[in-house]
Amino acid sequence: MALDSQGIVDRLASHAMSLGIFDRVNTHEPKNAPGRGLSCAIWVQRIDPAGTLSGLSSTTGRITFNVRCYTNMLQQPEDAIDPNLLRAVDALISAYSGDFTLGGTVRNVDLLGMGGSGGLYVEAGYLNMNERIYRLMTLWVPILVNDLWDQAA
């Protein structure tokens, strides 16, 4: 299977945009602070072989994307910040679970870690950007692509 890199990024972003909960969806890691509201950014974090799913003539690849949801942590009401982010993350996981081949562009979103390095997970944290502090939740979304690299002696 050839790597449809743009197709994969487009499908990940399309799901985020279709939810109607983000004020903006970027397909890159932002260099500047976003505007107000809830933001989503998508970029590649890691690429490695999925040995347990590979054969003797080709290697299945695992491409892990960061899908980061973030919002200004100084907004009011403060008690709504984490629940709003959690709702966004839950909606994204549901969307990726419901279309785990991303429209046939990949073998599957590795929800449960069948590729050998753990499945989809979320990590919360904070980010200081342009002297503003953001609360964030980052989804680590591993994508499996069959026969990505040929093997030869």
Predicted regions and their residues:
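Charged, amphipathic alpha-helical segments and their flanking helix caps
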Residues: M1-P34, R46-A153
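Two-metal-ion RNase H-like nuclease active-site motif
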Residues: I42
